[in-house]
């Protein structure tokens, strides 16, 4: 199983119907030490496996965007969690870490450029943490940065709004579950800064693959991102 598992919350903490045992109790019974925040992790002496959840998120599925937090309610940042994971796993035995900046995708689904930039910035902090580790262990470390897809079809230096046929927009009704007000706000901010979007969903646009370290040459050129697994395992 996993030795170190951290995230912004647990989906269906008590099952889909809400009638099951708390999942943290189940995890602890299976041998994991559940820590609410990196502060609790620092006092943990469990070497068989830990699960780290933000201190304020015991029964929440996800954090708000970092930029929306109050100054006195900041949660552990992605880079800090990655640094804790590296320290927990140590450098005596080989390890593999998958670290995801998932809020980048969420913000792009909303065409929310402000929060997407903030999420990318925090992901970049995590990449810097990984790169610092690579500098200390250059002959035995491989770092890969990529994405499973692009979202939103973002274009910089586009969309000044002149193509919108405002006179042709007809009055209509909104679905009860669609927050069009928020989406329109996000689009307005993007338009004001000459940023264009093509969709609120995933696109088929190519995504970059960056690699540094041992075996990085295997990731040069164009490859299908589903081939990454095989290249890593072969390494």
Could you say what each language-model-derived stretch is?
Residues 1-235:
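A post-motif C-terminal structural segment
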């Amino acid at each position: 199983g996993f030795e170190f598992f951290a995230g912004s919350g647990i989906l269906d903490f008590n099952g889909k119907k809400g009638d099951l045992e708390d999942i943290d109790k189940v995890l602890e019974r299976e041998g994991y030490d559940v820590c609410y925040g990196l502060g609790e992790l620092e006092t943990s002496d469990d070497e068989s496996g830990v699960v780290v959840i933000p201190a304020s998120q015991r029964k929440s599925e996800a954090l708000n965007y970092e930029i929306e937090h109050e100054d006195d309610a900041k949660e552990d940042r992605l880079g800090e969690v990655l640094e804790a994971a590296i320290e927990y796993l140590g450098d005596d035995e080989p390890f593999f870490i998958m670290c995801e900046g998932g809020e980048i995708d969420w913000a792009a689904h909303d065409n929310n450029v402000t929060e997407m930039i903030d999420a990318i910035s925090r992901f970049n902090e995590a990449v810097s943490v990984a790169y610092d580790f690579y500098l200390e262990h250059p002959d035995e470390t491989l770092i890969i940065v990529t994405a499973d897809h692009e979202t939103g079809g973002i274009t910089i230096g586009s969309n000044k709004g002149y193509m919108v046929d405002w006179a042709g927009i007809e009055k209509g009704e909104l679905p009860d579950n669609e927050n069009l007000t928020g989406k329109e706000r996000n689009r307005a901010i993007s338009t004001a800064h000459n940023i264009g979007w093509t969709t609120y969903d995933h696109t088929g646009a190519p995504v970059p693959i960056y690699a540094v370290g041992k075996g990085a040459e295997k990731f040069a050129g164009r490859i299908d991102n589903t081939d990454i697994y095989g290249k890593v395992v072969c390494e």
